[in-house]
Regions:
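Non-heme Fe(II)/2-oxoglutarate
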Residues: 1-73, 175
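Catalytic core of non-heme Fe(II) oxygenases with the double-stranded beta-helix
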Residues: 56, 60, 64-175
Length: 175
């Protein structure tokens, strides 16, 4: 079974609060041969725990798993704000490095053109993503995906990666 789920988990107002919190923070640009990645240097893990908690509850319910968080700390997770500006893109790649099992994202705005988020099945079929503010997606880190070129505006998302060591599969109570 391929895991690719999406659901609106955050209100437009909540997304605006998250975006405003980081809008003036310095952004590091990291480039490699295949991707362009932007991440905030100053994520406040304690203040942003409510965002992570909402993701965790959704992921646990969707996949019937338990995600372990040591000492209620979000520092065990990769947690990024990523912004793409006109001309930016994120070429086709997968995220199954550093023991990542699942990737989650939250779309914070829709004031951009282009920037389509595309996830591919193992047979290279495209799975659509709804570009609605507050929409979250969850997919297996091994699935290829990309963000097409931003034509206009800025596309901002929160990204969270869950690692294998944090996941315990729940037993089916019917068995």
């Amino acid at each position: 079974m391929i895991v690719f789920k999406q659901k609106i988990l955050f209100t437009e107002q909540e997304c605006d609060l998250i975006l405003k919190k980081y809008i003036d923070k310095p952004i590091n640009k990291i480039e490699d041969t295949d991707t362009m990645k932007y991440k905030s240097k100053d994520i406040d893990y304690n203040v942003d725990k409510w965002v992570l908690d909402r993701f965790i509850n959704w992921v646990e319910n969707e996949l019937n798993i338990k995600i372990e968080v040591s000492n209620s700390s979000t520092k065990d997770f990769e947690f990024y704000l990523q912004s793409y500006k006109a001309g930016d893109l994120f070429n086709k790649h997968n995220d199954n490095v550093y023991n990542r099992v699942y990737a989650c994202g939250l779309l914070l705005n829709n004031t951009f053109k282009g920037g389509e988020f595309i996830v591919y099945t193992p047979n290279d079929e495209m799975m659509p993503f709804n570009n609605t503010i507050g929409n979250c997606y969850l997919f297996e880190a091994s699935l290829s995906h990309e963000v097409t070129e931003i034509v206009e505006g800025t596309r901002s998302v929160v990204l969270i990666f869950f690692r294998n060591s944090q996941i315990t599969f729940k037993r089916n109570k019917l068995l």
